[in-house]
Amino acid sequence: MNYLNTNTPLLLFQKNLNSEIYVDKSLLIEKISKYINTGDCYICITRPRRFGKTINATMLGSYYTKGYESHKLFHNLSIAGTKMYEKHLNQHNVIYIDFSRMPDFCNSYCDYITNILSGLKEDLLEYYPHLKKKEYTSLSQMLKETTDTFIFILDEWDSIFYKKFVTIDDKTDYILLLKELLKDQPYVELAYMTGVLPIAKYSSGSELNMFHEYNFMNDCIYEEFFGFNEDEVKNLCLKHNSVNYEDLQKWYDGYYLSNGTHLFNPRSVHAALRDGVCLNYWTETGPMNEIADCIEHNVDEVRDDIVKMVAGIPVEVELNGYSAAELELNTRDEILSAMVVYGFLSYYDGYLRIPNHELMEKYQKVLSRDSFGEVKEIVDRSKEMLEATLAEDEHKVATILEAVHDREIPFLKYNDENALSCVITLCYLYARKDYVIEREEKSGKGYCDYIFIPKKKGQTAIILELKVGHSSEEALQQIKDKNYTQKVEHCNEILLVGINYDKKKHHECKIERITNRE
């Protein structure tokens, strides 16, 4: 069998169960099952790649299929403890299609879709021999003729849209094919579909409007089943002590459930625990490049928003999702919305943020692109800025800051503390290679503006305090009075950096080195 009651989802789900790092999401089955054979049987869940869509799709396919006995896969999972566990276990015909799978030597949409349709027709003819007595003009006719009902598990339904050989007409044909196959068909018990971007990205009207769609911005029903929450990650850390929770949180946290609970990137957490080290496991570069191209045009100040978020400043915005029209990356809201859907930004309580250190590294590369003009030029001098700071060259640090100010880039004008923070972030961007830079972190008796925590033992830590209209000496004194050095007192050397901006004197800098004797 190719798609009908195939053992493919069972084999794939078994592999995940065999993994030492597995989080039980089986209660999703209970949520989905109540919509079988109802008017609400069309469910589409869109999430960024790496957020567990395929694992859950294989789990559902394994549970529902009547092609194989799968109790052994589920008897130790949470779903086995529910009252409905046996009601749908191995009771349904399941058509499981992973649309990201391509046939060999596939060079056109025709090759792609013919392979899927031929495989499914082959399955139906084998499973229902009486269908061989008649010719059919469509797959839906064959399915009706079986007089059976089916659960459709359609994983990565939108993957074909990323292929270069697909034309606009091909996309239209594909949407109409899905409509004919699924919409208002008596043989559909359940249609569970997953993808990356919302249906509205591809469908201009009512073709697939039977689906109830749940994405990163509007899902308060299934959100707990995609990604790892705080408790799940803490439990994984107890079982696998290769990486501590705090490091995982810094690298891969930063998304939110509707109730404010934190959500982690599951694939990256898995990889870090498996390898015993936190690294950048984000591999999805295509959409990031597409969005970076849009940012470069500075559409409605999107580029300015990105610089602010790199500086750790949340950006206030109203995002309404994609329920109305096809997504075009032309406006600020459209670009920022797409970045949330792709997982490049997190959105909660009206504010956008760069979720974590893993993605921060990606944005730093975006800011270094040639087309960012003056922003790139500032970033290019950030190595020089770090070297001047470590060399205690107060004059050079002040001179570099003065040069940035003299450029008169609109969103870097010193009309508030956030603008000054953006300048500092850009000027010290290179330092992120060697330091974890924390902004407004609790240390000692208060909150300091910036702490540069060395990634390697033996490096010099940096405490940076900003002042506007005061003096750099006052900034240094505040670091001492508030004991901001407490968080990095384990370091042998600490640089205290006080920076002041005054409309008359402009920039001044004072640097003092503290050596901790062991």
What are these regions (language model features)?
Residues 487, 492-518:
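Domain-level recognition of nuclease-like catalytic cores that cleave nucleotide substrates
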Residues 151, 460-462, 495:
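Structural motif
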Residues 121-122, 421-431, 483:
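A short, contiguous, amphipathic alpha-helix enriched in charged residues
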Residues 428-436, 489-491:
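Short secondary-structure junctions
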Residues 1-416, 431-434:
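Phosphate-binding site recognition
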Residues 142-147, 432-457:
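Active-site metal-binding core of divalent-cation-utilizing nuclease and nuclease-like domains
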Residues 171-176, 468-486:
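Mg2+/Mn2+-dependent nuclease catalytic core
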Residues 424, 448-452, 460-468, 482:
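Conserved catalytic cores of phosphodiester-cleaving nucleases, focusing on short active-site segments
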